[in-house]
Amino acid sequence: MALSFVMASCVKTKTYRVNDANRDWFADSTNCNFAMLDDNGIQQSFRFAPADSYTTETGASILFVIPTDKGEHEHITQSGANSYGTIRVSTTISAYKLMGGEYSDIDELRLYFNEAVYVLGIERNLFYPDSDNKYKCYESSTENAMEYSAEYIDSYTVSEKNYEGVMHLKLIDVAYPLTKNFPTEIYYAKHYGLIQCTLDDKLTLRRLPSVSKE
């Protein structure tokens, strides 16, 4: 008992924080409320809460009286929806950094968009994609897995406004019937968040440059 206490006191806590550059993927407070226009000329207003952070712990166990290091990992999250409640988006970036070696500085991004869950290792998959540039996207209600491509675009123009630093995700393998309003293509900009999306592979919404006053 005493030995376990002594060994536990030797456990070291290492703190992992989300990389500074990745904090820019969340919408600034002035960009949380906005409007989007779809192909049918229907305008929808969106509201997002300011980004918030929390921490979780990993490790800290004692195996065969040998203490393991404890990790404290930062997570930053931001959520919002349109006024109709038909589009819900939540973005979380986590400082896991558990794999070591060449993966030791990678933050994980999880983009929840209605029933879709896109998972991405930002530093690796977005800037140094695999040779086939194919990653897994999940449908949360069915757990069906599909493939999507990811790319980083230096700049992209939507509704005559230019955005710098844009993440482009596109579904490339639809093997199952999709749930309604499933996002098949997403453009996500630094400091702004969602700027364009295509639902059900047929209806596209584009962000308007003016900020909603609602």
Residue ranges and their predicted role:
Residues 6-9:
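C-terminal motif of bacterial Sec signal peptides marking the signal peptidase cleavage site
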Residues 11-214:
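Conserved functional acidic sites
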